[in-house]
Amino acid sequence: MKKRWFLQVSLILFILVSFFQPLQLVSGQVDAPEAIVVQLKGPLTPVWSGYLQRGINRAMSTGAGLLIIELNTPGGSVDLMNHLVQQILASPVPVVVYVTPRGAMAASAGTLLVLSGHIAAMAP
């Protein structure tokens, strides 16, 4: 009788643990913050400033945990670069500057954009 009671209790516990374990994993995935991606490609232009600011604003309004800037530029105006760097430094959302795709560059003023991010990364 004791053996049967033990088997029944064990089976019930196994079923309960099996049932609730997947729910716990799913709830952890739902709470993960998203990342906003902004692509800046080509020579630095004044349009980039507004585009970058919209990306920062969107990251803040959606509660994103990260803003990723995909960068591929030969550079551009020093004044514009300074403005973009100030936007990145003032961002309340962490900024990753990712030089991509393979063979992309961040030359001249683009180098300073990469250095202004919280994290700098480059495609192989």
Regions found by a protein language model. Name each.
Residues 1-5:
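Positively charged n-region of N-terminal signal peptides that target proteins for export
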Residues 9-22:
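Bacterial N-terminal signal peptides
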Residues 19-124:
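Soluble extramembrane regions of membrane proteins in the secretory/endomembrane system
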